[in-house]
């Protein structure tokens, strides 16, 4: 890759921090200048897609158009089986356009009131898209999935989003109780980024 400045096409501070950390820990990208799109003065893309893939492409293309630089976009969310896959692509705004993480968690827990533990399966999904330019005809698209189940109350202080209510069976704790390194090794975003870095290294 000739251009070592990379735009992270997201306004989500948690995603920016997580992606920056992961990229800095990887030899192939340790020397990249990773800049969130908030460093430029332009509005976020309208996420009009109905899938994570569509929205990630929309965001990556928009960031490339606005900055003239390569971009990585992340579209991700939580799918809860008992809620027919909700909140899905609406995860970040489940409780409304200006919802906080706590607002979204509270709405989720309310929606799952009375649902037995054995029926609270859920999965985090992440789609990462890399585009060299806005006209890139072959964006790199990588996907990750992380299975778990939803707790009845938040546990842990790390992470962001729905992490405090997402139980990670193999670690016997919530996602919000994992270290950054542990989470990177297991998470949907870590899986997708590993695939993306392998593609970029080719």
From Swiss-Prot:
Concerning InterPro entries, the annotation shows: dITP/XTP_pyrophosphatase, ITPase-like_fam, RdgB/HAM1
Q: Known CDD domains for this protein?
A: HAM1 (cd00515)
Q: How is the cofactor bound?
A: Binds 1 Mg(2+) ion per subunit.
Q: Which domain of life is it from?
A: Bacteria
Catalyses which reaction? XTP + H2O = XMP + diphosphate + H(+); dITP + H2O = dIMP + diphosphate + H(+); ITP + H2O = IMP + diphosphate + H(+)
Q: What is its EC number?
A: 3.6.1.66
Give the required cofactors. Mg(2+)
Biological processes annotated in GO: nucleotide metabolic process; purine nucleoside triphosphate catabolic process
* Record GO terms (molecular function): dITP diphosphatase activity; ITP diphosphatase activity; metal ion binding; nucleotide binding; ribonucleoside triphosphate phosphatase activity; XTP diphosphatase activity
Keyword Magnesium tagged: yes
- Keyword Metal-binding attributed: yes
Binding of substrate occurs at 10-15, 76, 160-163, 183, 188-189
What's a single GO CC term here? cytosol
Query: What is the enzyme's main class?
Result: hydrolase
Active-site residues? Answer: 75
What positions does the entry give for Mg(2+) binding?
46, 75
The record's keywords, sorted A to Z, are: Hydrolase, Magnesium, Metal-binding, Nucleotide metabolism, Nucleotide-binding
Q: How does it assemble?
A: Homodimer.
Function, in words: Pyrophosphatase that catalyzes the hydrolysis of nucleoside triphosphates to their monophosphate derivatives, with a high preference for the non-canonical purine nucleotides XTP (xanthosine triphosphate), dITP (deoxyinosine triphosphate) and ITP. Seems to function as a house-cleaning enzyme that removes non-canonical purine nucleotides from the nucleotide pool, thus preventing their incorporation into DNA/RNA and avoiding chromosomal lesions.
Protein family membership: Belongs to the HAM1 NTPase family.
By what name is this protein known?
A: dITP/XTP pyrophosphatase
Q: Which organism is it from?
A: Idiomarina loihiensis (strain ATCC BAA-735 / DSM 15497 / L2-TR)
Taxonomic classification = Bacteria, Pseudomonadati, Pseudomonadota, Gammaproteobacteria, Alteromonadales
């Amino acid at each position: 890759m000739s251009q070592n400045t990379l735009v992270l096409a997201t306004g989500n501070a948690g995603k920016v921090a997580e992606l920056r950390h992961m990229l800095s820990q990887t030899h192939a990208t340790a020397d990249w200048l990773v800049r969130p799109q908030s460093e430029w003065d332009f509005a976020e893309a309208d996420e009009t897609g109905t899938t994570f893939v569509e929205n990630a492409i929309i965001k990556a293309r928009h960031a490339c158009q606005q900055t003239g630089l390569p971009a990585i976009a992340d579209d991700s969310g939580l799918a809860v089986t008992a809620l027919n896959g909700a909140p899905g692509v609406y995860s970040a705004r489940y409780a409304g356009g200006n919802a906080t993480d706590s607002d979204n968690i509270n709405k989720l827990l309310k929606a799952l009131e009375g649902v037995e533990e054995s029926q609270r399966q859920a999965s985090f999904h992440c789609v990462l898209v890399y585009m060299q330019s806005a006209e890139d005809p072959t964006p790199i698209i990588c996907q990750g999935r992380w299975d778990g189940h939803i707790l009845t109350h938040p546990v842990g202080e790390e992470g962001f989003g729905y992490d405090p209510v997402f139980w990670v069976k193999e670690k016997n704790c919530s996602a919000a109780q994992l270290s950054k390194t542990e989470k990177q090794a297991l998470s949907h975003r870590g899986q997708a980024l590993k695939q993306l870095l392998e593609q970029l290294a080719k």
